[in-house]
Amino acid sequence: MKNKTFLANCALVLCAVIWGMNFIFQKQASQHLGAFTFISLRYYLGVLSLLPLFFYMRRRKALAALEAGEEVERWHGRRFWLASLGASLANWGGAVLVQIGLHVADATKAGFIESAYIALVPVLDLLLFRKKTSRRVWIGIAMAIVGLYLLCISDGFSLDVNDAAIMASTLCFALHILMWSRFSPHVDALPFMVVEFLCTGTLSGPVSYTHLRAHETELHL
């Protein structure tokens, strides 16, 4: 049990490192691709990268299990697809807003603003599900935000429209995390991720196609 907890915490730390590096690449991409085009390509590539693992896990019949080892009702059919769509909408909203903001906003400041979702998660959990958070967690959140501010912000702090878009994305990502916390005991994570990534990419597809067609028209003119 302790080993599983340690490995889970290590996985979360690794996710945080990858998440932080992500802003640098997103900033570079925002200078060459529109937000919807980037999101569509990004999540379709995510689906392609997950498919080999998905089929491998499916062959092995490796199903996620709770630490207690108790059988939990798994969602299939309509409930699974509705949960996937809900998570996809929250993820898509956050991804698009942060990509729009990064077109102008500084990557380090965007990373700091985006990290504010760690405070929104327990707040929304309390408001939506009446789940209380311990004082130690709130102290940890405050320390994390102060630390991230000192790490990311060096020349003062001001907000503009692009920063506001990134701030709005934190609400979407906080909702996304809450959805995952509620859905994860009832769904197999890998198929859920594949469907979520596919839906997120597809939601951006029509807009990105329209944008590319408009760009081609401008080039011909």
Feature-to-residue mapping (PLM):
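Conserved small/polar residues in nucleotide/adenosyl-binding loops
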Residues: 210-217
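Hydrophobic transmembrane alpha-helices of multi-pass small-molecule transport proteins
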Residues: 50, 133-153, 170-173, 204
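Specific transmembrane alpha-helical segments of multi-pass solute transporters/efflux pumps
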Residues: 22-23, 51-114, 150
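Juxtamembrane C-cap of transmembrane helices in multi-pass membrane transport proteins
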Residues: 18-33, 39-41, 45, 93-105, ...
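Glycine-/small-residue-enriched transmembrane alpha-helix faces in small-molecule transporters
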Residues: 1-39, 156-182
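C-terminal transmembrane-helix exit sites in multi-pass transporters
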Residues: 49-57, 117-139
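Cytoplasmic-side transmembrane-helix entry/capping segments in multi-pass membrane proteins
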Residues: 84, 133-144, 188-196
